[in-house]
Every structure is written in structure tokens, then in C-alpha cells.
């Protein structure tokens, strides 16, 4: 579903972006668990557009997070309270970790729920519905 969404928006998307956790930095104690955002998107004014795993592209991510607007993205088959909680908690953790507030919060899903979509609207979380059919598993855009 992330690939289908990326086809609509393009940009540079990093997957499985770590937040919190005991990685040796002074922000978090050893009692903190590492969490991962499903994806963070940057408009990609600089550099190649595509979907990139954070684990192999951390320097590019760190450069982008300092120069571009970040969108936090959670991807779920169907919108649920867990996804909403993840994007809300992820906002605060991301801001503390990377010293920048996300410009946009997005939940990408195949199915909706009117009540939960209302909650998202009140909290300025975009809900984007995409076709759940699997797209190619690629790290870079098609040529």
C-alpha cells in the first residue's frame, strides 16, 4: 500500500525509521524501547525520488530531515485506533529525536471507519485510502 501511495505523491520515502530506544544517544534511557515509523516522506526537492529503507540510507535521511518537511506515515490494512495512536505518539517522539516537528501526519489504509476518520480529521491526520493490491516491492521508482 505504501508503494501505491508513493505513486500518488512521489518524493523520498524512508521506511522503518527508528524513534526512541537505547541506541547510545542521550535522549532515551536504556529502559526505552526502539520503535519504528512505517515511513517518513520528504518532498524530495534534492536527490533521487524513491522508497528507501532507513537502515541502508540513514545519512540521506539525516540530511533530508534537516532541510525538508517531514511527513509521518503509518500504513495499515484498515484504519484503527492503534494506527492513530502510533502516529500521535510518533509525532512527539520524532520531534524530540530529530528536533523538527512533522509537517503532515498520514495514515494510509485500504479500508475506513467513519468514526475513526472523524477523529483523524479533528487531529489533523490525513487518511488516504489506496487499493490493497500488492505493488512491486521496490526500493527505487520504476524507470
Each predicted region: which residue ranges?
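Charged, terminal alpha-helix-loop-beta segments
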Residues: 1-143
Amino acid at each position: 500500500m505504501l508503494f501505491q501511495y508513493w505513486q500518488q505523491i512521489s518524493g523520498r520515502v524512508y521506511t522503518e525509521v527508528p524513534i526512541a530506544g537505547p541506541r547510545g544517544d542521550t535522549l532515551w534511557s536504556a529502559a526505552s524501547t526502539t520503535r519504528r515509523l512505517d515511513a517518513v516522506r520528504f518532498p524530495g526537492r534534492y536527490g533521487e525520488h524513491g522508497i528507501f529503507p532507513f537502515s541502508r540510507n540513514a545519512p540521506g535521511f539525516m540530511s533530508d530531515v534537516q532541510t525538508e518537511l517531514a511527513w509521518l506515515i503509518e500504513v495499515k490494512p484498515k484504519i484503527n485506533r492503534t494506527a492513530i495512536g502510533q502516529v500521535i505518539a510518533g509525532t512527539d517522539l520524532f520531534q524530540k529525536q530529530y528536533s523538527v516537528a512533522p509537517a503532515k501526519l498520514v495514515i494510509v489504509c485500504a479500508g475506513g471507519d467513519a468514526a475513526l476518520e472523524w477523529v483523524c480529521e479533528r487531529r489533523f491526520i490525513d487518511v488516504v485510502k489506496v487499493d490493497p493490491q500488492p505493488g512491486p516491492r521496490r526500493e527505487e521508482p520504476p524507470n
